[in-house]
Amino acid sequence: MKSQNKYSIRKFSVGASSILIATLLFLSGGQAQAAEKQVNMGNSQEDTVTAQSIGDQQTRENANYQRENGVDEQQHTENLTKNLHNDKTISEENHRKTDDLNKDQLKDDKNSSLNNKNIQRDTTKNNNANPSDVNQGLEQAINDGKQSKVASQQQSKEVDNSQDSNANNNLPSQSLTKEAPSLNKSDQTSQREIVNETEIEKVQPQQNNQANDKITNHNFNNEQEVKPQKDEKTLSVSDLKNNQKSPVEPTKDNDKKNGLNLLKSSAVATLPNKGTKELTAKAKDDQTNKVAKQGQYKNQDPIVLVHGFNGFTDDINPSVLAHYWGGNKMNIRQDLEENGYKAYEASISAFGSNYDRAVELYYYIKGGRVDYGAAHAAKYGHERYGKTYEGIYKDWKPGQKVHLVGHSMGGQTIRQLEELLRNGNREEIEYQKKHGGEISPLFKGNNDNMISSITTLGTPHNGTHASDLAGNEALVRQIVFDIGKMFGNKNSRVDFGLAQWGLKQKPNESYIDYVKRVKQSNLWKSKDNGFYDLTREGATDLNRKTSLNPNIVYKTYTGEATHKALNSDRQKADLNMFFPFVITGNLIGKATEKEWRENDGLVSVISSQHPFNQAYTNATDKIQKGIWQVTPTKHDWDHVDFVGQDSSDTVRTREELQDFWHHLADDLVKTEKVTDTKQA
């Protein structure tokens, strides 16, 4: 008979626990975890079946602990009933369901009473779990286990008597009294063993302000580490509600620390929480989106737009000048960004030499204080150091490339920079060896594979007659430099890029002293400026010092805005040519060399197509490296039509300008397939 009773009790325990686990897994979305323990107590008739309120099976050690300490099962039943009833009070929105299931819940209090011994003050933190879900699970477990109860009549009578007694109790709902019994060393050891055998699960509420609190449910028997206490503490229902809605108080922080200490000492593994996994997955997705932001651009290598002679960015330009890249028609850089191309506008000297501008362009991209070089500064008589750039691509190094697009003189500047990166500056290297000191990494060379492509728009690769016949005249230089001197005062935002020559008033310097100092500058007699570099002599010197890089894609775009005169072979400016260029266009149109006459107002077609001493070919759909790919000449396009500065020109429309730049940018993206060293 005893064997049969033991079998029935075991069957009831396994059946009830299995159903309870399935129910809680279904209702809590996989957040509740259960553990099953079998209880074999020999011939004792006081063996009871423990049904966990959160889904955990009570262990045999806990039953021994309860029996050894002479726990009054009836009193534990009443205390647990009070706690469950208080759960119902806190969850008012589930009040109706709890009332219907309350009686069935009381029937199982006999089996669950052993859990109440270790209930602590922080039990209220776990009341965020829906009590109706727990009651429903217990109800199903009890109903399915009734058949097993019949097998043990004596056990059933004890359970029925306890249920009848509990059903008639008048349960208080205004306060919850909790006791913390003192424990001796053996009790503490037993309690520690119980905690080790009990699984921990985390419950995350889904709605309201409860979502802000992460609740750790240790099942009622291991809610908090049990410590000897002398006083009883009574919590009202209103206090429980306030604790749920208010921010965490220092006392709660202490409780949490105690719980963490218990977990640490017990070495209990915390089971994965589904809700936490979902939040972590979402966070990873968000992070992925953030990282992918750079990947949204069509171009892997950023595009850097390099302005030409007398070019400015909007923050330092004279107010009479239009926006360089797009004029009043459009903002080219911004339009490229909006259409998926990463692009920048370089800010370098407007009237400096190609060498000085190339050094500035390097630091504009890389970042840092401009170092023109000790040897160069000593040779031409200007300051060695210039302005400091923040840098748009601080990680710019071999393998990390950029596309360089230069308009007018900007194309020459780009070529000079590429030469310095690849081969360095022999004069600077020798000077540093002789005199010591620092040397810029730019002048050391061996910095290949930092440029993906070089594209030039109306660049005077071979110089221009406009500079030979007018631009480089002493009178013209004097006028321009005087204007630069005037704008160099300390109250002006305009920057001509000639500070290395002293054309910038110092903070504590009077304007009179500034003018006197500028008169002594070597700028007035130097060739280290843009006026000279744009002459055919200066351009030829640059061509001798530079070479083609076999790893770079080169391409040129050329415009033409003149036509043949009726009675001669001279070229005359078109009616729609940018008005300031009419004079220079006609001047170039009557040059001695007939092949130089066709021009865009400033630059001859023959000079814009390619350097005379370097290889070239007609551009096709096939992308080639290490050779100038010359695109067909764009007729009726003057020098500024490539950048849209002529707002009065009705022939060249905004849509046409936009299409040109979109095609150019798309072409740059295609070149990355043949210049990407990572794929090669």
Swiss-Prot record:
Protein's GO biological process: lipid catabolic process
Superkingdom to which the source organism belongs: Bacteria
Which residue stretches does the UniProt record annotate as biased composition, category Polar residues? 125-138, 162-193, 204-223, 235-246
Q: Where in the cell is it found?
A: Secreted
Q: Which Pfam families match?
A: Lip_C, YSIRK_signal
Residues given in the record as Ca(2+) binding sites: D638, D641, D646, D649
Family that this chain belongs to? Belongs to the AB hydrolase superfamily. Lipase family.
Region named Disordered: 82-259
State what protein this is by name. Lipase 1
| Any one Gene Ontology cellular component term annotated for this protein | extracellular region
Upper lineage is: Bacteria, Bacillati, Bacillota, Bacilli, Bacillales
Q: Which reaction does it catalyse?
A: a triacylglycerol + H2O = a diacylglycerol + a fatty acid + H(+)
